[in-house]
Swiss-Prot record:
Disulfide bonds join 133-371. This is Dual-specificity RNA methyltransferase RlmN. The lineage of its organism: Bacteria, Pseudomonadati, Pseudomonadota, Alphaproteobacteria, Sphingomonadales. Specifically methylates position 2 of adenine 2503 in 23S rRNA and position 2 of adenine 37 in tRNAs. m2A2503 modification seems to play a crucial role in the proofreading step occurring at the peptidyl transferase center and thus would serve to optimize ribosomal fidelity. The active site is at 120 (proton acceptor), 371 (s-methylcysteine intermediate). S-adenosyl-L-methionine binds at residues 195-196, 227, 249-251, 328. Its EC number is 2.1.1.192. It catalyses: adenosine(2503) in 23S rRNA + 2 reduced [2Fe-2S]-[ferredoxin] + 2 S-adenosyl-L-methionine = 2-methyladenosine(2503) in 23S rRNA + 5'-deoxyadenosine + L-methionine + 2 oxidized [2Fe-2S]-[ferredoxin] + S-adenosyl-L-homocysteine; adenosine(37) in tRNA + 2 reduced [2Fe-2S]-[ferredoxin] + 2 S-adenosyl-L-methionine = 2-methyladenosine(37) in tRNA + 5'-deoxyadenosine + L-methionine + 2 oxidized [2Fe-2S]-[ferredoxin] + S-adenosyl-L-homocysteine. It comes from the Bacteria. Residues 10-20 have a biased composition (Basic and acidic residues). Binds 1 [4Fe-4S] cluster. The cluster is coordinated with 3 cysteines and an exchangeable S-adenosyl-L-methionine. [4Fe-4S] cluster binds at residues 140, 144, 147. CDD domains: Radical_SAM.
Length: 391
């Protein structure tokens, strides 16, 4: 990751525990930094400890409670101080390449990083909630065969600022500043966009802690869901250090099929994965694990598959909800969606066993924003980079 970002960022040495990245223009981007790092950055530019502590508190409030992107409107900071802050610091947002709105109201943004790579995020409005699906990586290493993102190679991890920036940008678009505890349009965040969050653990953890901070965005951990394809060694740590809701991309109940469509199963099998789910901190009947199950015609959608799913969940005594996801096609995809009748029968079998098994309503399909469809121009850039390297 650092080798990719190094072309656009340098590092500023501070008394913080870690170096702080500096932009091409020499300024330090405050978005995504912890309070400790902001204070250290201010001190590195000449402020004493007392002033740095005060300014950190003020900046935090303006960034995460009011959505400020400039210093000149920060009315509780002295006018003489504001130009100095603007000279040395920035409060960024992701660059928007395109924004599309589906006929059903779903919005998809194509975003660009400072070093020129693309990634995507999606906002899904409903009557009682608004869910933002955000990315953790540019590309992915997991190669899930039904997932469009899985056909890309991994370019790099997103930084803390790039992860948090997606939420900030969405709230800009929804006019949700200043932050308010009730009546929000953006009520939920799911880490189900591009990438495997547990393969970018530190940045995802730090970003979500910032999002949950009570003095800023203040989104409850009950409103945040982290999705994994089954990086078993990191799951317990995620529960302990992040503590948000867990979703697992299961998608099959036999080794043969899951090995094919979710190749990480060859490393961490179904039984090992479900045992890790059972041990996830805080799991109980009031806080269930969500299992994602994409419905693929004649692949994983038989009545036998449904009964085996029930058996597995009951064997591991998992408080569970199963989201049945009609497969969303993408160009040259190797699978077809199960028939509505077969999906309904699958749901019925699971539901009759006492396990919630709703069929997810497809959203944003007309703009390639539905589950499994995200795939940005980052892949094309990767191919161009490879061609340059080869030449």
């Amino acid at each position: 990751m650092t080798s990719v970002v190094a072309d656009s960022l340098t590092e500023t040495k501070t008394d913080s525990q870690k170096p702080i990245a500096t932009r091409k223009d020499g300024r330090i981007d405050l978005l995504g930094l912890s309070r400790e790092d902001i204070r250290a950055a201010l001190k590195s530019k000449g402020l004493d400890e007392k002033q740095a502590k005060l300014r950190t508190k003020q900046l935090w409030h303006w960034m995460y409670n009011r959505g400020a992107v400039a210093f000149d409107g920060m009315t509780d900071i002295a006018k003489t101080m504001r130009p100095w802050l603007a000279e040395h610091f920035a409060i960024s947002r992701p660059e928007v390449v395109t924004m599309q709105i589906s006929t059903d109201g779903t919005r998809k943004w194509l975003l660009k990083t400072d070093d020129g790579y693309d990634y995507e995020m999606v906002f899904i409005p409903d009557a009682d909630r608004g869910t933002l699906c955000i990315s953790s990586q540019i590309g992915c290493t997991l190669n899930c065969r039904f997932c469009n993102t899985g056909t890309m190679r991994l370019v790099r991890n997103l930084t803390v600022g790039e992860i948090v920036g997606q939420i900030m940008l969405a709230r800009d678009s929804l006019d949700e500043w200043p932050s308010k505890p009730e009546g929000r349009l953006l009520t939920n965040v799911v880490m189900m966009g591009m990438g495997e969050p547990l393969y970018n653990f530190d940045n995802v953890r730090d970003a979500l802690k910032l999002v949950m901070d009570g003095d800023g965005i203040a989104l409850s951990r009950r409103r945040i869901t982290l999705s994994t394809s089954g990086v078993v060694p990191m799951m317990a740590r995620a529960g302990e250090e992040i503590g948000v809701n867990l979703a697992v991309s299961l998608h099959a109940v036999t080794k043969v099929v899951r090995d094919e469509i979710v190749p990480i199963n060859k490393k961490y099998g179904i039984d090992e994965l479900l045992a890790a789910c059972a041990a996830y901190p805080g799991v109980n009947n009031a806080r269930r694990i969500t299992f994602e199950y994409v419905m693929l015609k004649d692949k994983n959608d038989s009545e036998e598959d449904a009964h085996e799913l029930v058996r597995l969940l009951q064997y591991y005594r998992l408080p569970a909800k199963v989201n049945l996801i009609p497969f969303n096609p993408w160009p040259n995809s190797p699978y077809e969606c199960s028939t509505p009748e077969r999906i309904a029968r699958f749901s019925e079998i699971v539901f009759n066993a006492g396990i919630s098994a709703p069929v997810r309503r497809t959203r944003g399909q007309d703009i390639m924003a539905a589950c499994g469809q995200l795939k940005s121009a980052a892949e094309r850039q990767s191919k161009r980079d490879s061609m340059i390297t080869l030449s």
